[in-house]
Amino acid sequence: MYGAGAIGGSLGALLSAAGEQVALIARGAHLEAMRANGLLLQRPEGESRHAIDVFGAPREVDWRDGDVVVLAMKTQDTVDALRSLPPGVPVVTLQNGVANERMALRLFDEVYPVCVMFPTSHLEPGVVVAHSSPTPGILDIGRYPSGVEGQAEAIAAAFRAAGFRSEPRADIMRWKYTKLLMNLGNAVEALCPPSEQRQEIVVKLREEARAVLDRAGIEFAGEEENRAYRADAISVKEIAGQPRTGSSSWQSLARGTGTIEADYLNGEVVLLGRLYGIPTKWNEHARRLANKAAHQKAAPGSLTTEEWLSSLDLVG
């Protein structure tokens, strides 16, 4: 598991508890905390501590035939991560956005995209939180660019054994584009406090994106189909002392990481807009403001929606 934060750490703990042999690759204070005390997973049912092998880099791992690497870092870190892996290893992209798979396929033959519906958080070294119960999430998988060949079924079976809903899908990228639409609000939801006006901005971001995807001929699920897909599996519940925080972008600001995923979420829409000649000023504005906040290490909710909108017309 390359990246042991909210998603990677939670999945690694659940896979380990289900009997899979798991190793985590992490860094910084989180790495040191896990080396000292293991990984603490908090869920609505209670908490559990997991003694999992943890490493600071792929070169420290004793790679063996049959190993699979699961990428669980933010997309801005993917290229460096891929270059550090041994040749020929199957790569599972447990990540938001739709850019990671193309990056991975340039270097690796077997690439397995996962559409991640897994509400988690990670704000404290050595601790990850999974908020949905009894099913922790949905992790459908496929083979990139399409199909379910290779190890997709075996990986889905491992996810199911760990409690997830997971099935191989030949159209997995259709679902990853659907998830991309959901994630377009991450930036403004991280930057601005909750309000009706904030939700109106999210609607604009998604409307703009749907127009671009339609022009590009890229398929995605409609809102009703997407709601039905998630409804019977994702059930976020309270955890004592651990209120549900925000998205992965919100958590990046809260931890002061200095980076954020907006270039590969809102920026994906901007890229397609430029390729197909469609203006995307709402998503470009979200991308710029998110990067500015991350670089300045601004706190979540530090921008009002009035400030967000007042600078929108400055986007060329």
Where are these regions (language model features)?
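NAD(P)-dependent Rossmann-like dehydrogenase/reductase catalytic/cofactor-binding core
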Residues: 203-316
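NAD(P)+-binding Rossmann beta1-loop-alpha1 motif at the extreme N-terminus of oxidoreductases
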Residues: 1-47
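Short phosphate-binding/catalytic loops that engage adenosine nucleotides
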Residues: 20, 39, 89, 109, ...
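Rossmann-like NAD(P)(H) cofactor-binding subdomain of soluble oxidoreductases
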Residues: 46-128
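Active-site-proximal catalytic alpha-helix in oxidoreductases
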Residues: 173-212, 237-241, 245
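Anion (oxyanion) recognition and catalysis
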Residues: 16, 105, 160, 214, ...
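Rossmann-fold dinucleotide-binding core
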Residues: 96-178, 185
